[in-house]
Protein backbone atom coordinates (compact mmCIF):
# COMPACT_ATOMS: atom_id res chain seq x y z
CA UNK A 1 0.00 0.00 0.00
CA UNK A 2 2.81 2.36 -0.96
CA UNK A 3 0.56 5.15 -2.20
CA UNK A 4 -1.39 5.23 1.05
CA UNK A 5 1.62 4.72 3.27
CA UNK A 6 3.97 7.18 1.61
CA UNK A 7 4.29 10.46 3.42
CA UNK A 8 2.46 9.20 6.46
CA UNK A 9 5.15 10.49 8.76
CA UNK A 10 3.83 13.98 8.03
CA UNK A 11 1.40 15.79 10.25
CA UNK A 12 -2.15 14.58 10.66
CA UNK A 13 -4.79 16.48 8.68
CA UNK A 14 -6.52 19.06 10.84
CA UNK A 15 -9.97 17.79 9.88
CA UNK A 16 -10.09 15.33 12.66
CA UNK A 17 -11.76 12.57 14.52
CA UNK A 18 -15.02 12.74 16.37
CA UNK A 19 -13.96 12.91 19.96
CA UNK A 20 -15.36 14.01 23.25
CA UNK A 21 -13.25 16.94 24.28
CA UNK A 22 -12.51 15.61 27.76
CA UNK A 23 -12.81 11.85 27.70
CA UNK A 24 -10.81 8.82 28.53
CA UNK A 25 -10.44 6.25 25.77
CA UNK A 26 -13.13 3.60 25.86
CA UNK A 27 -13.85 1.00 23.22
CA UNK A 28 -17.25 0.12 21.84
CA UNK A 29 -18.94 -3.00 23.17
CA UNK A 30 -18.74 -5.94 20.76
CA UNK A 31 -18.71 -9.69 20.42
CA UNK A 32 -16.16 -11.56 22.48
CA UNK A 33 -12.82 -11.82 20.70
CA UNK A 34 -13.57 -9.02 18.22
CA UNK A 35 -11.27 -5.97 18.37
CA UNK A 36 -13.56 -2.93 18.50
CA UNK A 37 -12.90 0.73 17.63
CA UNK A 38 -12.70 3.46 20.25
CA UNK A 39 -16.11 4.85 21.21
CA UNK A 40 -16.51 8.25 19.55
CA UNK A 41 -19.88 9.08 21.05
CA UNK A 42 -23.35 8.88 19.54
CA UNK A 43 -25.37 11.55 17.77
CA UNK A 44 -27.61 11.70 20.84
CA UNK A 45 -24.62 12.43 23.07
CA UNK A 46 -23.41 15.10 20.66
CA UNK A 47 -26.65 17.04 21.16
CA UNK A 48 -25.61 17.88 24.71
CA UNK A 49 -21.86 17.20 25.00
CA UNK A 50 -18.64 18.95 24.02
CA UNK A 51 -17.08 17.37 20.92
CA UNK A 52 -15.02 17.98 17.82
CA UNK A 53 -15.80 16.19 14.59
CA UNK A 54 -15.39 16.28 10.82
CA UNK A 55 -18.57 17.56 9.20
CA UNK A 56 -20.37 18.49 6.03
CA UNK A 57 -22.19 21.75 6.82
CA UNK A 58 -25.42 22.08 4.83
CA UNK A 59 -26.79 25.38 6.12
CA UNK A 60 -26.98 27.92 8.93
CA UNK A 61 -30.36 29.39 9.87
CA UNK A 62 -29.34 32.73 11.37
CA UNK A 63 -32.88 33.54 12.58
CA UNK A 64 -33.24 30.29 14.50
CA UNK A 65 -29.50 30.25 15.26
CA UNK A 66 -29.23 26.64 14.10
CA UNK A 67 -26.79 24.72 11.92
CA UNK A 68 -27.67 21.66 9.85
CA UNK A 69 -24.71 19.36 9.36
CA UNK A 70 -23.73 15.77 8.71
CA UNK A 71 -21.29 14.25 11.19
CA UNK A 72 -18.49 11.98 9.96
CA UNK A 73 -16.43 9.62 12.06
CA UNK A 74 -13.60 7.21 11.43
CA UNK A 75 -12.31 4.09 13.13
CA UNK A 76 -9.49 4.42 15.64
CA UNK A 77 -8.14 1.67 17.88
CA UNK A 78 -6.07 1.41 21.02
CA UNK A 79 -2.44 0.72 20.11
CA UNK A 80 -2.30 -2.39 22.30
CA UNK A 81 -5.30 -3.87 20.45
CA UNK A 82 -3.69 -3.33 17.03
CA UNK A 83 -0.29 -4.55 18.23
CA UNK A 84 -1.97 -7.81 19.27
CA UNK A 85 -3.59 -8.42 15.84
CA UNK A 86 -2.38 -11.47 13.96
CA UNK A 87 -3.59 -13.77 11.18
CA UNK A 88 -6.96 -15.10 12.32
CA UNK A 89 -7.77 -12.08 14.49
CA UNK A 90 -11.14 -10.38 13.92
CA UNK A 91 -11.74 -6.63 14.12
CA UNK A 92 -14.68 -4.34 13.45
CA UNK A 93 -14.34 -1.56 10.87
CA UNK A 94 -16.35 0.61 8.46
CA UNK A 95 -14.76 -0.89 5.33
CA UNK A 96 -14.32 1.71 2.55
CA UNK A 97 -16.36 4.18 4.61
CA UNK A 98 -19.51 2.03 4.70
CA UNK A 99 -22.18 3.36 7.07
CA UNK A 100 -22.43 0.00 8.84
CA UNK A 101 -19.39 -1.55 10.52
CA UNK A 102 -18.49 -5.15 9.73
CA UNK A 103 -16.24 -7.77 11.23
CA UNK A 104 -13.10 -8.44 9.18
CA UNK A 105 -10.84 -11.46 9.67
CA UNK A 106 -7.12 -10.79 9.31
CA UNK A 107 -5.78 -12.99 6.49
CA UNK A 108 -2.44 -11.21 6.16
CA UNK A 109 -0.85 -8.38 8.09
CA UNK A 110 2.27 -6.25 7.62
CA UNK A 111 3.54 -4.03 10.43
CA UNK A 112 6.08 -1.28 9.83
CA UNK A 113 7.31 0.02 13.16
CA UNK A 114 9.52 2.68 11.55
CA UNK A 115 6.65 4.70 10.12
CA UNK A 116 3.95 3.39 12.46
CA UNK A 117 1.79 1.76 9.81
CA UNK A 118 -0.10 -1.52 9.72
CA UNK A 119 -1.45 -2.97 6.47
CA UNK A 120 -4.18 -5.60 6.81
CA UNK A 121 -5.34 -7.89 3.98
CA UNK A 122 -3.27 -5.99 1.40
CA UNK A 123 -4.32 -2.54 2.59
CA UNK A 124 -6.74 -0.24 0.80
CA UNK A 125 -5.29 -1.06 -2.62
CA UNK A 126 -6.50 -4.65 -2.24
CA UNK A 127 -9.76 -3.95 -0.43
CA UNK A 128 -8.17 -4.24 3.01
CA UNK A 129 -7.37 -1.71 5.71
CA UNK A 130 -4.37 0.53 6.40
CA UNK A 131 -3.79 1.90 9.89
CA UNK A 132 -1.49 4.69 11.03
CA UNK A 133 -0.24 5.17 14.56
CA UNK A 134 -0.57 8.52 16.30
CA UNK A 135 0.36 8.47 19.97
CA UNK A 136 -1.49 5.67 21.72
CA UNK A 137 -3.98 5.04 18.94
CA UNK A 138 -4.07 3.72 15.40
CA UNK A 139 -6.55 5.19 12.95
CA UNK A 140 -7.66 4.20 9.48
CA UNK A 141 -5.82 5.95 6.67
CA UNK A 142 -6.48 6.28 2.95
CA UNK A 143 -4.92 8.25 0.11
CA UNK A 144 -3.42 11.65 1.02
CA UNK A 145 -3.29 10.52 4.67
CA UNK A 146 -7.00 11.14 5.28
CA UNK A 147 -8.87 8.87 7.65
CA UNK A 148 -11.49 6.59 6.07
CA UNK A 149 -14.54 8.69 6.95
CA UNK A 150 -17.99 7.18 7.37
CA UNK A 151 -21.26 9.02 7.81
CA UNK A 152 -22.68 8.97 11.35
CA UNK A 153 -25.80 11.00 10.56
CA UNK A 154 -27.34 14.45 10.36
CA UNK A 155 -27.74 16.86 13.27
CA UNK A 156 -29.40 20.23 13.70
CA UNK A 157 -27.49 22.01 16.46
CA UNK A 158 -27.89 25.41 18.08
CA UNK A 159 -25.14 27.89 17.23
CA UNK A 160 -23.47 29.80 20.05
CA UNK A 161 -23.87 33.59 19.75
CA UNK A 162 -20.09 33.98 19.94
CA UNK A 163 -19.32 31.20 17.42
CA UNK A 164 -16.01 31.64 15.59
CA UNK A 165 -14.83 30.49 12.17
CA UNK A 166 -11.17 30.17 11.21
CA UNK A 167 -10.96 29.63 7.44
CA UNK A 168 -7.64 29.05 5.67
CA UNK A 169 -9.14 27.12 2.73
CA UNK A 170 -8.28 29.68 0.02
CA UNK A 171 -4.87 28.16 -0.74
CA UNK A 172 -1.97 26.28 0.79
CA UNK A 173 -0.36 29.41 2.28
CA UNK A 174 -3.56 31.26 3.16
CA UNK A 175 -3.63 33.26 6.37
CA UNK A 176 -6.77 32.15 8.25
CA UNK A 177 -9.75 34.47 7.84
CA UNK A 178 -11.36 34.88 11.26
CA UNK A 179 -15.12 35.44 11.49
CA UNK A 180 -17.30 35.56 14.58
CA UNK A 181 -20.98 35.72 15.45
CA UNK A 182 -23.89 33.65 14.11
CA UNK A 183 -24.88 36.05 11.33
CA UNK A 184 -21.38 36.55 9.92
CA UNK A 185 -20.49 32.85 10.17
CA UNK A 186 -23.83 31.94 8.57
CA UNK A 187 -23.07 34.33 5.71
CA UNK A 188 -19.61 32.80 5.20
CA UNK A 189 -21.11 29.29 5.04
CA UNK A 190 -23.85 30.25 2.57
CA UNK A 191 -21.42 32.12 0.29
CA UNK A 192 -19.43 28.93 -0.29
CA UNK A 193 -22.24 26.51 0.28
CA UNK A 194 -20.95 23.26 -1.23
CA UNK A 195 -17.40 23.40 0.09
CA UNK A 196 -17.76 22.44 3.76
CA UNK A 197 -16.77 18.80 3.73
CA UNK A 198 -15.36 16.28 6.22
CA UNK A 199 -12.00 16.60 4.47
CA UNK A 200 -11.62 20.30 5.24
CA UNK A 201 -14.10 21.13 8.00
CA UNK A 202 -13.91 20.46 11.74
CA UNK A 203 -16.75 21.54 14.02
CA UNK A 204 -16.30 22.07 17.76
CA UNK A 205 -19.27 22.02 20.12
CA UNK A 206 -19.67 23.05 23.73
CA UNK A 207 -22.61 21.63 25.67
CA UNK A 208 -24.32 20.72 22.38
CA UNK A 209 -23.94 24.12 20.69
CA UNK A 210 -21.56 24.90 17.81
CA UNK A 211 -18.78 27.04 19.29
CA UNK A 212 -16.04 26.99 16.65
CA UNK A 213 -15.50 25.93 13.03
CA UNK A 214 -12.14 25.28 11.43
CA UNK A 215 -11.73 24.96 7.64
CA UNK A 216 -8.37 24.12 6.09
CA UNK A 217 -6.99 24.08 2.57
CA UNK A 218 -7.06 20.70 0.88
CA UNK A 219 -5.36 19.85 -2.43
What are these regions (language model features)?
Residues 18-219:
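Solvent-exposed hydroxyl-ligand-binding patches built from regularly spaced Ser/Thr
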Amino acid sequence: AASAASGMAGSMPAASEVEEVSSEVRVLPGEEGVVMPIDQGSLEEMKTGSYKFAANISSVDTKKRQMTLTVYGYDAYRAEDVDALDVGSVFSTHLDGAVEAQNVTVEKIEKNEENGTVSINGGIEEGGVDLWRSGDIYRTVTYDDYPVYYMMGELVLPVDDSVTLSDSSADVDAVPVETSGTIEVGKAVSEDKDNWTPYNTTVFTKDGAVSNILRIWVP
